[in-house]
Amino acid sequence: MENKELRKSYFQRIYQSYIPAYAFGGALIASVPRAFKRPYGGPFVPGCLLCGGFNAIGGLAIASGDLTNGSGICTAWSIAYLMINATKSIKSFRLYPIALTTFATANAVGYGKTFMNEY
């Protein structure tokens, strides 16, 4: 029982920090050169820049001490990424698009849970 509580508290603590937001934003912005080539199943350039940039802004809000608004921003833009790219990335069955979709799902769930607990 104690191990389950430890994992739960770790999951809650990691999504009360800005690290996942910066990591996902950085991964999306780093994938812009790849998005110019338009790989099958991969994200497109405006989606990378918008979702990555706003996740970084959400991380900045969390780093500034505004956990509620920062986690709300990260949740909204992670869900936006999923709405735009989830279906085609899963259908492509390629590693990089599926990894980004998994990262977006984890951020949406983690920061969404944090937002609901704070709000």
Curated annotation (Swiss-Prot):
Domain of life: Eukaryota
Example GO BP: heme biosynthetic process
Compartment(s): Mitochondrion membrane
Keywords associated with the record: Membrane, Mitochondrion, Transmembrane, Transmembrane helix
Main localization, broad class: mitochondrion
UniProt key word Transmembrane helix: yes
Family matches, as InterPro entries: AIM19
Membrane protein topology class: Multi-pass membrane protein
Keyword Lyase: no
One Pfam family per UniProt: Aim19
GO cellular component term, pick one: mitochondrion
Membrane-spanning parts: 13-32, 42-64, 69-86, 93-112
PANTHER family for the chain: ALTERED INHERITANCE OF MITOCHONDRIA PROTEIN 19, MITOCHONDRIAL
Family of this protein: Belongs to the AIM19 family.
Protein's name according to its UniProt entry: Altered inheritance of mitochondria protein 19 homolog
